[in-house]
């Protein structure tokens, strides 16, 4: 079997969210194969199902006035940040009732990507995502509707980590964030990171990647 890979480039969050829903409907209907959307977002704060707003360090209006979009969404988890230099992946895959297994597979794929750079990263029991020590390298939060996933992961490649300081990331006080750039001491080409993520997903899910159609607004 195969999965479709669509590289969308830099896409505003609201536009990408709407496109996810469209792709989700097509996968549910059986009109397209499992699909992995890869993209970056302009600066945006998103709040998931567990969020109450207490982990926002400023009023919602402050974020919008200071160059951040802000969205309340249906993914799992609390509050997180997306921005340029961060590789966001939305795997829109049939998962049925195997949601925990699906989350573990995403984690394993990211662990393999990190290992390819010589980084020992791992899941931490009780916390979503992939970690290096006390710092989160990759956030994970999904939603499942009609047996098909959407939302996904956010891997810090060359992310400006200072932008995380305006929230309590994932609601985890005392935990930090990191990036491939910080860990390696150099910029990582985004196209290289994308290729490694696609290869890791192919290995973990046992699917063959096929380049998808060009995204149109």
Curated annotation (Swiss-Prot):
Tell me where in this chain the BPL/LPL catalytic domain is found. 30-209
Naming one, the record's GO cellular component terms include:
cytoplasm
Q: Name one GO biological process term.
A: protein modification process
Asked whether the UniProt record includes Acyltransferase among its keywords, one would answer yes
EC top class, as a word: transferase
Active site at which residues? 170 (acyl-thioester intermediate)
Q: Which CDD domains match?
A: LipB
Compartments, as annotated in UniProt: Cytoplasm
According to UniProt, the reaction catalysed is: octanoyl-[ACP] + L-lysyl-[protein] = N(6)-octanoyl-L-lysyl-[protein] + holo-[ACP] + H(+)
- Using the chain's own numbering, where are the disulfide bonds? none
Residue(s) at site: Lowers pKa of active site Cys: 136
Report keywords, A-Z.
Answer: Acyltransferase, Cytoplasm, Transferase
Q: In which pathway does it act?
A: Protein modification; protein lipoylation via endogenous pathway; protein N(6)-(lipoyl)lysine from octanoyl-[acyl-carrier-protein]: step 1/2
Q: Per the UniProt record, which residue ranges are transmembrane?
A: none
Q: Which SUPFAM superfamilies match?
A: Class II aaRS and biotin synthetases
Q: Where does substrate bind?
A: 75-82, 139-141, 152-154
Write down the EC number.
Answer: 2.3.1.181
Instruction: List, in alphabetical order, the Gene Ontology terms for molecular function in this entry.
Output: lipoyl(octanoyl) transferase activity
Its biological function? Catalyzes the transfer of endogenously produced octanoic acid from octanoyl-acyl-carrier-protein onto the lipoyl domains of lipoate-dependent enzymes. Lipoyl-ACP can also act as a substrate although octanoyl-ACP is likely to be the physiological substrate.
Matching entries from HAMAP family are given as: LipB
Q: Record's family?
A: Belongs to the LipB family.
Miscellaneous note of the record? In the reaction, the free carboxyl group of octanoic acid is attached via an amide linkage to the epsilon-amino group of a specific lysine residue of lipoyl domains of lipoate-dependent enzymes.
- What is this protein identified as? Octanoyltransferase
Q: Which organism is it from?
A: Thermus thermophilus (strain ATCC 27634 / DSM 579 / HB8)
State the organism's lineage: Bacteria, Thermotogati, Deinococcota, Deinococci, Thermales
């Amino acid at each position: 079997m195969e999965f479709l890979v669509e590289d969308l480039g830099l896409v505003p969050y609201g536009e990408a969210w709407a496109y996810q829903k469209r792709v989700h409907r097509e996968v549910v209907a059986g009109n397209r194969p499992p699909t992995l959307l890869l993209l970056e977002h302009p600066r945006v704060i998103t709040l998931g199902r567990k969020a109450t707003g207490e982990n926002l360090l400023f009023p919602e209006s402050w974020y919008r006035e200071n160059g951040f979009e802000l969205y309340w969404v249906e993914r799992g988890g609390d509050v997180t940040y997306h921005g340029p230099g961060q590789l966001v992946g939305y795997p829109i895959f049939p998962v049925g009732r195997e949601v925990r297994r699906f989350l573990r597979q995403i984690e394993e794929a990211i662990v393999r990507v990190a290992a390819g750079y010589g980084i020992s990263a791992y899941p931490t029991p009780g916390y979503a995502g992939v970690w290096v020590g006390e710092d989160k390298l990759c956030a994970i939060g999904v939603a499942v509707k009609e047996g098909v996933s959407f939302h996904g992961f956010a891997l810090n490649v060359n992310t400006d980590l200072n932008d995380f300081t305006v929230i309590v990331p994932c609601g985890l006080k005392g935990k930090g964030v990191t990036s491939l750039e910080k860990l390696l001491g150099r910029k990582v080409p985004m196209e290289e990171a994308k290729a490694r993520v696609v290869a890791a997903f192919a290995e973990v899910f046992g699917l063959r990647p096929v380049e998808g159609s060009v995204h149109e607004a």
